[in-house]
Design a protein with these regions (language model features):
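Cytochrome P450
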Residues: 1-147
Length: 147
């Protein structure tokens, strides 16, 4: 939100956008970077044939920024109509059981931060945990005025 002050202001003025903002944030920065799956039968993706029992890697960031699905996929837009179509929590029988809990927790955290510290902004670069499987922030310095 601090990188997109116009979107932050829009959200502060209309908190009904909060659930969609959470989906849009997750779409842009998926908590899981990739997942490996094993095919059960022969299939084809584009021109690539994939045999049964082959390992495939699914990169969520690529899917969540697919320009055929998301217009201006690199833009953070809390009013994006299809933000909920992200695949950050998987899909179908592989859907993460914690998806709804994570969405509720993120919505509540953002609500509390925006209500208590509306002027909060990032004061330095954020640091990511060195990990090739999950995308986690280890440090994000912020500045705000106390209540």
């Amino acid at each position: 939100m601090t990188e997109n002050p116009d979107q932050k202001e829009k959200l502060i003025n209309n908190m009904e956008l909060l659930p969609n903002m959470v989906n849009e944030a997750i779409r842009l920065i998926s908590p899981v970077i990739y997942m490996r799956r094993t095919t059960t039968e022969e299939t084809q993706v584009g021109e690539q044939k994939i045999g049964p029992q082959e390992k495939v890697v699914l990169y969520y960031g690529a899917a969540n920024r697919d320009p055929d699905i998301f217009t201006n996929p690199d833009k953070f837009d809390i009013e994006r109509e299809n933000a909920k179509k992200h695949l950050a929590f998987g899909y179908g029988r592989h859907l993460c059981l914690g998806k709804h809990m994570a969405n509720m927790q993120l919505a509540e955290v953002y609500k509390q931060i925006l209500e208590r510290f509306p002027d909060m902004h990032q004061s330095d670069e954020w640091k990511v945990v060195p990990n090739n499987f999950t995308h986690s922030i280890s440090e994000m310095p912020v500045t705000f005025k106390p209540e």
